């Protein structure tokens, strides 16, 4: 299970894909940094989206706050996604490739 990515379903499938992505971004970004939203209009993926957060704790807060939230006239269902998002895998790989010394310096700069 991936704790950065939320699987959202029972979305109104009559909404334009770009409008849906924008509305989901506006709603979920109030809980933390959203790095990606995947909302496809294929028959298999209609009414579903994946919202990817940078921080797993932000995803947990958003899931708790928005579970059963009425969104475009339908009650959203939210759970953790089963697989890791490609964007999170890329971020982790970039951090790992920098080496431990560079990571320590970056972390020290943040403090």
Curated annotation (Swiss-Prot):
Cite the Pfam families for this sequence. RRM_1 (PF00076)
Keyword Kinase in the entry? The reply is: no
Q: Which UniProt keywords apply?
A: mRNA processing, mRNA splicing, Nucleus, Ribonucleoprotein, RNA-binding
Q: Which domain of life is it from?
A: Eukaryota
CDD domains on file: RRM1_U1A_like
GO cellular component, alphabetical, reads: cytosol; nucleus; spliceosomal complex; U2 snRNP; U2-type prespliceosome
Q: Where in the cell is it found?
A: Nucleus
Single Gene Ontology BP annotation: mRNA cis splicing, via spliceosome
Provide the RRM domain boundaries.
4-83
Cite the SUPFAM superfamilies for this sequence. Answer: RNA-binding domain, RBD
Q: What is its main location?
A: nucleus
Q: Which GO terms describe its molecular function?
A: U2 snRNA binding
Record InterPro entries: Nucleotide-bd_a/b_plait_sf, RBD_domain_sf, RRM_dom
| Subunit structure comment from the entry | Belongs to the 40S cdc5-associated complex (or cwf complex), a spliceosome sub-complex reminiscent of a late-stage spliceosome composed of the U2, U5 and U6 snRNAs and at least brr2, cdc5, cwf2/prp3, cwf3/syf1, cwf4/syf3, cwf5/ecm2, spp42/cwf6, cwf7/spf27, cwf8, cwf9, cwf10, cwf11, cwf12, prp45/cwf13, cwf14, cwf15, cwf16, cwf17, cwf18, cwf19, cwf20, cwf21, cwf22, cwf23, cwf24, cwf25, cwf26, cyp7/cwf27, cwf28, cwf29/ist3, lea1, msl1, prp5/cwf1, prp10, prp12/sap130, prp17, prp22, sap61, sap62, sap114, sap145, slu7, smb1, smd1, smd3, smf1, smg1 and syf2.
State the protein's purpose.
Involved in pre-mRNA splicing. This protein is associated with snRNP U2. It binds stem loop IV of U2 snRNA.
**What is the recorded name of this protein?**
Probable U2 small nuclear ribonucleoprotein B''
- Lineage of producing organism: Eukaryota, Fungi, Dikarya, Ascomycota, Taphrinomycotina
